[in-house]
Amino acid sequence: TFLRDVTMLSEMREQMSVQKELLEAFQQLSTAGDAQELSRKTPKLFTSSAMIKLYGEVNTIAETDATVLLLGETGVGKDVIARRIHALSLRKNKTFIKVDCGSIPENLIETELFGYAAGTFSGASKTGKIGLIEAAAGGTLFLDEIGELPMPMQTRLLRFLQDWEIMRVGSTTPKQIDVRIVAATNKNLERAIARGEFRSDLYYRLKVAVIAIPPLRDRQADILPLARMFLRFYGSKYHRQLAFSEEAESLLLDYKWPGNIRELENLVQGLAVTSKDSVIRASDVPISGVAKPAASARRDGLDFELDGET
């Protein structure tokens, strides 16, 4: 059991290291607000007009302290945008904390977010526990998958956003917290409100600065720059010099990428591991040139969940 735990910890650290390096690669983008200058300085990563415009909006919003709501399908890069907002803000030298609202058990999420006072329950820390909201004080709290937050926690979060005060579980003393909120979802929250699954008042509290990130299929000009960047990254990681053939690149361009950037990254990583030659050919790429349908239909706006992640 000990050896298994050590192995799992090592694998987690490796994955975190890779993600950190990729995020840093993504964030080698211009801080300029002017679209022409932004295009000139970032030709290697995003060349589509949609993303050049989006990054201009991100740069403007980042300078404020406004609450931000990121909308987009699974895998479009909402995490990267959230971190960029933090990196360009006045809070950049403070803490950035990401909370995956969909992965924390419902019976634990209250204490995870708000913390608890000493002696609140049997087995609790004698000194109490600081919550993630409090831990992010002065910095940015990224609430990923906000649409998965249970209704009781939506109420508590709304109260916090109204007063910017928290009260640890088991405590009677409120505490003022200065933190910027960035939330993200791949769900259509207006549809969720109509179904009684999301509070309308919380939605309007979050809907201050809204950034809608287009899917990869709608910005074809970004596919090859991203694919080449991932290939350079994973080629370097695995000590290989790799390149795509023209036919392979054509195949990548023709595919519709229902899993967006994450699907592209995972595919390229797999190719970097399994390719027998330095040139990756179309026959090596495990996708069809014909567009594959997304896992769920477009009937519900932004509700395109493939695996519940963003």
Give the role of each language-model region.
Residues T7-T67, L71:
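Flexible nucleotide-interacting loop at or near the entrance of a catalytic core
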Residues T127-G138, F142, P150-R156, M167-N186, ...:
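AAA+/SF3 P-loop NTPase mechanochemical coupling elements
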Residues E57-G123, E134-P150, P215-Q220, L267:
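Conserved post-Walker A coupling segment in P-loop NTPases
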Residues T7, G147-E148, L158:
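Catalytic acidic motif of RecA-like/P-loop NTPases
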Residues T1-L3:
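Sensory-domain boundary capping and coupling elements
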Residues R91-K94, G170-R180, K187-A294:
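Nucleotide-binding/hydrolysis machinery
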Residues R298-T310:
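Bacterial C-terminal helix-turn-helix
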